[in-house]
Design a protein with these regions (language model features):
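N-terminal lobe/hinge region of extracytoplasmic solute-binding protein
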Residues: 58-115, 234
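Alpha-helical secondary-structure segments
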Residues: 58, 136-146, 188-194, 198, ...
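Surface-exposed binding/hinge segments that line
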Residues: 123, 142, 147-150, 154-218, ...
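Detector for C-terminal structural segments
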Residues: 245, 350-381, 424-434, 460-582
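Gly/Pro-rich hinge or "lid" segments in bacterial periplasmic/extracellular proteins
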Residues: 94-97, 198-267, 272
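Extracellular/periplasmic solute-recognition and catalytic clefts
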Residues: 155, 242-253, 262, 274-335, ...
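Bacterial lipoprotein signal-peptidase II cleavage site
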Residues: 24-33
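Structural transition elements
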Residues: 239, 363-405, 420-427
Length: 582
């Protein structure tokens, strides 16, 4: 997933480049039996457990979501916020701070499948209702997923998984232009998916926000359909999406038609959760420090609050530093830098030691020699195809040799893209610029607002070429914890789309494609994903920088605080957070 940001990624899933990947080197202190606050207490525990209801939780973010449409969002923090007002057939449940597991949400159980994983059937619970009191039906779940096929309208979410697995005519363009999709069969209480290929991980798709129901009869109401649905999405969860002012604020108030008896995943206690969007990172830090805001919804803390956390034990007890399953990297575009040796020159010349420092120092994460993070199949702790030397400052000699091979012995010029606002991305750019200049590669910066960076700036292959973007900052976390969940969206050549493309370099390598195509059948092993990682590195399109950690801060007044580790970067699970009724 995209790590906005967060800087998900993924996360991430951010702009991915806007994220403050900061952490602390102190050992983790587990939550005590009483749930008392301590450093890292929310990572694998629950801080201040409470059943007291009422109050308003006050959240901040530096940018708006890429979309509030559940089918059209791909930022990890926005997936986390979707848990407030949308539900899906399945979801992630975290009991008493344990690791999250898949669990039924709208469905009565985990569903059933046939022997070859090509047919999946789920039964909906009775008594499920939207915030307007109307029934949630299997047809609504079907309609929401059909919307993913309307890629001319819904082009920012994880549609590639669904398009690659659910059987459909080649000319099916979603419900707006093509109507009903016959391969998804519904009754009054069940929904059946007929797939075009075996897919043993299908339950993970049913836990995505993209599987949330959308009322097929009215969608978002008059004027809020298609691309505008994200301005007024219908609520199926415990909170109602309301008072939305784009790029400024949104509120979530209790859904009187939601029933705790139908929801074993969420246990909300707050009356209201307010999100204020503030592009001033220092202002966000100040509000968190002063206690006028409760937590940041999208990113790590900024540099000012980070310093306080690292130096003041009284502040540190209210912070958490989860290790995250995402990789921060630079995408080197073969459509702009066409010669593989020219791309390799960038890999060798990059000063990873300085890049890690620019991202927040050693507390930001561990320098990466390959793309696959430690928690995902195919990871190798020793892989490092483009060695940056013993001190990770780059191998200038090898970079110059690669430039000779690509016919550019004196270097070349290109552009580096990143999302704004960001405290760190300009520092990362400056570090990269200095390192590449050592071998004659000259770079200039080009930026885009975080809200459009992934969808239409680097998410558009045509725009990459038109803008001459040779390098783009990004970060990625697994959409679900498998090799396929990490790699498919960023490396499968079959899933390249005109906008909202997450395979930023438009990689279409037959070796990579073959492994990914075999994965849904359960035929790709850890060794295969190790081979995939090696092949991607040979293609020199993804330059891994670090495996990340994040630093978050929670207001001491908050209750029921725990990390949502189902996402790539451990943000707090805000749906269950309270204020002790205040």
């Amino acid at each position: 997933m995209k790590i906005k940001r967060k800087g998900l990624v993924l996360v991430s899933l951010l702009a991915a480049t806007a994220m403050a990947l900061v952490g602390c080197s102190s050992p983790t202190t587990p939550a005590t039996a009483s749930g008392a606050s301590s450093f890292n207490a929310a990572v694998d525990g629950i801080v201040n457990p409470s059943t007291v209801k009422g109050g308003t939780v006050k959240l901040l973010s530096s940018t708006d979501c890429d979309s509030w449409d559940p089918q059209n969002t791909y930022y990890g923090w926005c997936w986390n916020m979707q848990r407030l007002f949308t539900r899906s057939l399945l979801g992630y449940q975290k009991v008493n701070g344990s690791k999250p597991v898949l669990a039924p949400d709208l469905a009565t159980d985990m569903g059933t499948h046939n022997a070859d994983f090509t047919k999946w059937t789920y039964t909906l619970q009775k008594g499920l209702k939207y915030s307007d009191g109307t029934d949630i039906t299997p047809k609504d779940v079907k309609y929401g997923i059909e919307r993913l096929f309307a890629t001319d309208i819904i082009n920012g979410g994880p549609a590639s998984y669904f398009l690659a697995t659910i059987s459909h005519p080649a000319d099916y363009l979603g419900p707006y232009k093509s109507g009903d999709l016959a391969s998804i069969v519904t009754t009054d209480s069940t929904i059946e998916f007929n797939l075009s290929t075996s897919y043993s991980d299908f339950n993970y798709l049913m836990a995505m926000a993209a599987s949330a129901p959308v009322p097929y009869k009215v969608e978002g109401g008059t004027g809020f359909v298609g691309a505008d649905y994200g301005k007024q999405p219908v609520s199926s969860g415990p909170f109602v999406f309301t008072k939305y002012v784009p790029t400024q604020s949104v509120s979530f108030v209790r859904n009187k038609f939601w029933k705790q008896s139908t929801d074993k995943i969420r246990k909300p206690v707050a009356n209201e959760i307010d999100l204020t969007i503030d592009s001033d990172e220092n202002d966000i830090d100040s509000k968190l420090s002063a206690g006028t805001a409760d937590a940041r919804a999208d990113l790590d803390v900024g540099t000012t609050l980070k310093s306080k956390i690292l130096t003041n034990p009284k502040v540190k007890v209210n912070a958490d530093n989860p290790t995250t399953a995402f990789t921060r990297y630079l995408t080197v575009m073969p459509s702009v830098i066409t010669n593989v040796y020219c791309r390799q020159a960038i890999f060798y010349a990059a000063n990873k030691a300085e890049l890690v420092q620019a991202f927040g120092g050693t507390t930001a994460g561990v320098a990466a020699g390959s793309m696959t993070p430690p928690t995902i199949a195919g990871h190798s702790a020793t892989a490092n195809m483009y060695s940056s030397g013993k001190d990770n400052t780059g191998d200038v000699a090898k970079a110059k040799a690669a430039l000779v091979k690509c016919g550019q012995p004196n270097g070349f010029t290109t552009k580096v893209a990143y999302a704004t606002p960001s405290q760190l991305a300009p520092k990362v750019f400056a570090s990269l610029q200095t390192a590449l200049a050592r071998v004659g590669i000259k770079v200039t910066e080009t930026t885009s607002a975080a809200s459009s960076y992934y969808s239409t700036f680097i998410g558009s292959p045509t725009n990459i070429v038109n803008q001459g973007i040779g390098i783009a900052m990004a970060a990625w976390g697994a959409d679900f914890p498998t090799g396929y969940g990490f790699w498919n969206s960023i490396a499968n050549g079959a899933d390249i789309v005109p906008t909202g493309n997450t395979n930023y370099p438009s990689l279409n390598d037959p070796v990579v494609n073959k492994i990914l195509d075999a994965a849904p059948n359960g035929k790709s092993t850890d060794a295969d994903f190790r081979k995939l990682d090696d092949q991607v590195m040979k293609d020199a399109v993804y330059l891994p920088i670090l495996f990340g950690k994040s630093l978050y801060y929670r207001n001491p007044r908050l209750t029921n605080v725990t990390s949502d580790n189902a996402l790539a970067f451990g943000l707090y699970d805000f749906v269950n957070v309270g204020t002790g009724g205040k």
